[in-house]
């Protein structure tokens, strides 16, 4: 499985934790079991082919969105530091089933962003990030990149089949 769309990024390894090989993960998944339940995961460094790794255990830091995980074979801080920066992946066929109106954030990548007022093109969703809540990274038509909070009030309509979402940004948000 090597095609880009065959994988689902569930987080990024952002730092070593302690001396016993634990690693901090910034999640891009709303499913905690992906960071807690043992089993097969995959690591990807930059654009290299993903490599298999076995998650041994994990826990969420109290009051934070960061998880601390341990992998089989990563037993000290040096080994943990050697995998920092990698993306944590699962095969895309492991996407959980969603209820009506729910979305996998990764499915929003590449969608056209349009204004709710007149349907005119604003730009394209090029990335997702988290800063307390989910943010869409949108490259505007004129080339500038902006962060849009992914909340119903600002992103009221999403049409995955037609490849667009509507945004209703508060005044000044696109000028930041």
UniProtKB/Swiss-Prot annotation:
Family annotation (InterPro entries): PRC_barrel-like_sf, PRC_RimM, RimM, RimM_N, RimM_N_sf, Transl_B-barrel_sf
GO cellular component: cytoplasm; ribosome
Domain PRC barrel: 99-173
GO molecular function: ribosome binding
SUPFAM superfamilies: PRC-barrel domain (SSF50346), Translation proteins (SSF50447)
Location of the protein in the cell: Cytoplasm
Primary site of residence: cytoplasm
Keyword Glycoprotein attached: no
GO BP: any one term: ribosomal small subunit biogenesis
Keyword rRNA processing attached: yes
Keywords: Chaperone, Cytoplasm, Ribosome biogenesis, rRNA processing
Subunit structure comment from the entry: Binds ribosomal protein uS19.
Domain free text: The PRC barrel domain binds ribosomal protein uS19.
PANTHER family: RIBOSOME MATURATION FACTOR RIMM
Protein family (similarity comment): Belongs to the RimM family.
Free-text function comment from the UniProt entry: An accessory protein needed during the final step in the assembly of 30S ribosomal subunit, possibly for assembly of the head region. Essential for efficient processing of 16S rRNA. May be needed both before and after RbfA during the maturation of 16S rRNA. It has affinity for free ribosomal 30S subunits but not for 70S ribosomes.
Protein name per UniProt: Ribosome maturation factor RimM
Lineage of origin: Bacteria, Bacillati, Cyanobacteriota, Cyanophyceae, Synechococcales
